[in-house]
Amino acid sequence: MTTASTTPNSDTSNLHEVAPDDPIRERIRQAAQNVREQTPLAQSFTNFVTINLVANAQLAAGGTAAMSFLPNDVTSLASSCGATYINVGTLLPFYRDALQEISEHLSRHGCKWVLDPVAAGVGVARTEILKGFKDYPPTVIRANASEALVLHDMWQLGDAAGTDEHNGPAGVEAADSVDAAITAATDLAAYLALHSPTHTGAVAVSGEVDLVTDGRLVYRLPGGSAMMTKITGAGCSLGGVTATYLAVADALVASLAASMLYNVSSGAAERASHGPGSFQTAFLDALWNVTPEEIASAPLYLA
C-alpha cells in the first residue's frame, strides 16, 4: 500500500522550521492529548489486505476502531463516529454504487471523513468511484504523490489541470516525487475546504519528506523510517489514524498530528527492531508509548 515517510535525513535547507512556541505545535499536542483522553471512534471502510494493521494502529494511537464492508453499517454508524475512513485499495463490484451512497450520506450529514485513493487511475471501477467523490468530497485526502496528481487530473482542478507532467498511476506505490505534487495537493485541499461545512480541508502526501497542506499553508515533515516501505499497510494505517485524529481536531491539525506521530514512532521502531517482522511490532508499541509532547516537537517546516 502507500507508505509513510521513508528517509530520516532529507534536505530541508530551503524550508523554514516551525518554532517550538508556534501555536500550531500546541494545537497538535492538544489533539494528541485529546485522542488519548477521549478514545474517539473512527470507523473504516478499508481494504482486505491491511485492515488488521489499520485497526491496531488506531487502537495503539489511542482511538477506537470499527471496521465494516457493509454500506448500511457505515451510514448507520456515521453519526456516532467522530470520523470515517474510506480506502479504495481492494474493490468489489457493488462498491461502485455503495461508495457513492456512503460519500453522499457523509456529505449531507456533515460527517468528517478521510479518503485514501489507493492506486488512483488503475481500473475503470476505481476511476469512476474516485471521480464520483468530487461531488461529495472528503474532509482529508491522504495519498502518495502519484495518487494526488492523478486525482487532481480526475477532478480537473486548477489552471493546470490535466497538463501537469507526471508518471501517472503506478499501482499502489508512488512513481512521482512529493515535490511534483505540491500544486496538485494545494488545489485539492482548497477544493475540499470550499465544499466543507466548516470551510476546512487538508491533503497529506507521504514520501521522502511528507507534505501537508490546507490549500494555503504548505508544511513539510522530514523524518520517519525506510522500514515503513517494508511492511504492508503503512500508508493505509496512517489514513485510519488520521481519521482518529480528525475525530478531535480540524483537518489540518489532524493531518499534521497523525503524520508527525508516524514519523516519531517509525524512527523509534527502526532503532528497536531487527527486520520487518519485529519492526511492525515495535511500531505499534511506539504508537502506544509516544507522548503528545514528543509528537508536537517532531520536525516540522513551512515551505
From Swiss-Prot:
EC numbers on record: 2.7.1.50
> Key word Kinase present in the record?
yes
Question: Biased composition, Polar residues: where in the chain?
Answer: 1-15
- One biological process term in Gene Ontology: thiamine diphosphate biosynthetic process
Binding of substrate occurs at: M67, G233
Which cofactor does this sequence's record say it needs? Mg(2+)
Q: What is this protein called?
A: Hydroxyethylthiazole kinase
Organism field = Bifidobacterium animalis subsp. lactis (strain AD011)
Tell me what gene encodes this: thiM
